[in-house]
A protein has these predicted regions:
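Extended C-terminal regions of large enzymes
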Residues: 459, 463, 468-559
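Hydrophobic alpha-helical hairpins/lids featuring a short glycine-rich hinge
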Residues: 185-188, 192-211, 218
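Non-catalytic, peripheral interaction segments enriched in hydrophobic/basic residues
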Residues: 429-475, 482-484
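A conserved non-catalytic segment of reverse transcriptases
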Residues: 286, 366-432, 436-440
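Short, solvent-exposed helix-loop connector elements
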Residues: 193, 297-302, 415-429, 440-452, ...
Length: 559
């Protein structure tokens, strides 16, 4: 019996390495790595791979197997059902924990001025599969998630979102132009531009914002409160009260407003001073925008509506506080900033005028300028408005109240809702009004607002009565009152149905706000912020979002 040719066994180890010597390597395709060496490469990486792991896990450079799943690999294609299953199976607590650990390391490296390490950690974060998942989740949970960019693309299904994760790469990345629309500016008849990126560009901005945020928080002015993690307008108002309330506090205030801040920041300044991949940043800044089917270039500014824009604006304006501290040490010069609005106190008017020129010079380098119309110097006895509140001393006592403009805006907003609600059911109207009433009252609950709440309750009642009369022009007062208002406990005239009740402004009790510690960093002072949230014992949607930032490692109790 004639035997056939023997089957050649697959080459492994040395045999495979020898087999590639003639055909692989220099001048030809890359040599194939023996399959048996794969685990060695993981356990004992060399070259750039070793450097990257050393950044993540220190000198040993060993990467636990569970972390390998966080690195983005280009796998075989999956069906929509497979992708949807992968997205729905993501453990978001672990994702947030992984990203937060890297962000914490970036913040520590910034604090220690280890800029080379900062760049390596940023690279690791922006190429992390977990960070990409989180970036996609961020943009698909925002209010504008159903507003497409110029390409008309939306990520609605779980499959869309998982597919988007694999598309987040810096290789040959090119940002699409933004879609420009104009929206009404609150309290005015004018409109302001809003630029809408595509979904993929939003996610890329969110991804790089994750790597930039620890830097922004660590290097920020201590008295900057806008677009900051766990800081609020209420913190700014409490600090302003501390600076101005005492008998010997400074009496002059420079109210500063930057003209078109987001639209005019110098691109060159950003590229030379912001620690971020310069190629990617250039793509964000130079994308241009489309309006009325025409493409316009963007030579200045960061687009309003961009995910990363608030971070870039804050980084541009940080430094004013330290500049004033150097120029005017121990001279009652206090600086408070919220986004592009700021206050500077001064003991005399002449010093306030001098400070205005110092800030003007600081802004010029960054391509910005003060608004001549809105930048004014005011005496505390005359009062001034800041962030929707009026600050004024009455016979030596500083009071903070809701400003007239803020009261006018909420009244107009309620009027617009009632105008739209001509055919709504009472339950639909109550749901719409409760959102507005509770939100406005919570914003002002920490100041002298009890009288204002009572007046607004009266205004709201009169508006509701007119609304009911328009719905039933042929019915009498008694019938209308019985139809829409009821008794609840000791209260008469409660606007309610069998299911829902309209909340009043005065239902919100005045409660003083505890100011955040000025030097606290959310990436380095985790226990402080956890204790702060536990102490408040108020679970709002905002505080739930904050808890998700810290909810890994151990449970949060006492809420």
């Amino acid at each position: 019996m004639e035997l056939g040719k023997p089957h050649e066994l697959p080459k492994t180890g040395k045999n495979l390495a020898r087999g590639t010597d003639g055909s692989g390597g220099r001048g030809d395709s890359k040599k194939q790595m023996p399959a048996c060496n794969r685990q060695d490469r993981i356990d004992h990486p060399t070259g750039n791979g070793a450097d990257l792991l050393r950044v993540f896990y220190g000198k040993e450079g060993r990467l636990p197997m569970n972390v390998l799943h966080s690195i983005t690999f280009h796998d075989e294609k999956h069906t929509d059902k497979d992708l949807a299953t992968q997205w729905n199976m993501i453990h978001w607590k672990d994702v947030r924990a992984h990203v937060n650990r890297l962000q914490t390391r970036i913040a520590k490296a910034v604090r220690e001025r280890k800029w080379h390490l900062v760049k390596r950690l940023q690279y690791l974060l922006t190429h992390s599969h977990h960070a990409k998942q989180l970036a996609v989740r961020v943009v698909t949970q925002k209010r504008g998630k159903r507003t497409p960019g110029v390409d008309g693309e939306l990520w609605i299904t779980a499959s869309d979102k998982m597919q988007a994760v694999s598309r987040l790469t810096d290789k040959q990345y090119s940002a699409r132009p933004l879609k420009r629309i104009f929206i009404p500016k609150p309290g005015t008849d004018t409109k302001r531009p809003l630029s809408i990126p595509t979904m993929i560009d939003r996610a890329m901005q969110a991804l790089y914002a994750l790597a930039l945020q620890p830097i922004a928080e660590t290097m920020a002015d201590k008295r900057s409160f806008g677009f900051r993690l766990f800081r609020s307008a209420q913190d700014a108002s409490v600090y302003a009260f501390t600076c101005l309330a005492r008998k010997y506090s400074p009496e002059w205030v420079l109210e500063g407003d930057i003209k078109g801040c987001f639209d005019n920041i110098s691109h060159e300044w950003l590229k030379n001073n912001v620690l971020i991949d310069r190629t990617i940043l250039t793509q964000f800044l130079k994308a241009g925008f489309v309006y009325d089917q025409k493409l316009y270039p963007t030579d200045l500014g960061t687009p309003q509506g961009g995910v990363i824009s608030p971070l870039l604006a804050n980084l541009t304006l940080d430094g004013i506080e330290s500049l004033l501290a150097q120029r005017y040490p121990k001279k009652k010069v206090y600086f408070i900033r919220y986004a592009d609005d700021f206050l500077v106190t001064a003991p005399i008017k002449e010093m306030a005028e001098e400070i205005r020129e110092v800030i003007r010079e600081f802004l010029t380098v960054r391509g910005l300028e003060l608004s001549e119309k809105k930048t004014v110097i005011t005496h505390i006895a005359d009062g001034f408005d800041f962030l929707g509140w009026n600050f004024r001393k009455y016979q030596g006592t500083l009071l903070i109240k809701p400003s007239r403009k803020s009261i006018g805006r909420i009244t107009e907003r309620i009027r617009n809702i009632l105008h739209k609600a001509a055919a709504w059911t009472q339950d639909e109207l109550i749901a719409a009004l409760n959102t507005v009433v509770v939100g406005w009252a919570n914003y002002h609950r920490h100041i002298v607002a009890a009288d204002t709440f009572g007046k607004l309750d009266s205004i709201l009642w009169n508006m509701l009565w007119k609304w009911a009369k328009r719905r039933h022009p042929e019915k009498g007062h008694q019938w209308i009152a019985k139809r829409y208002w009821h008794t609840e406990g000791t209260r008469n005239w409660v606007f309610k149905t069998g299911i829902n009740r309209l909340k009043q402004f005065s239902d919100t009790k005045i409660r003083r706000h505890s100011q955040v510690r000025l030097d606290a960093n959310p990436f380095l002072d985790r226990d402080y912020f956890l204790g702060r949230m536990n102490a408040s014992r108020v679970l709002t949607p905002e505080s739930q979002t904050k808890l998700s930032f810290f909810s890994y490692g151990r449970p949060v109790t006492g809420l």
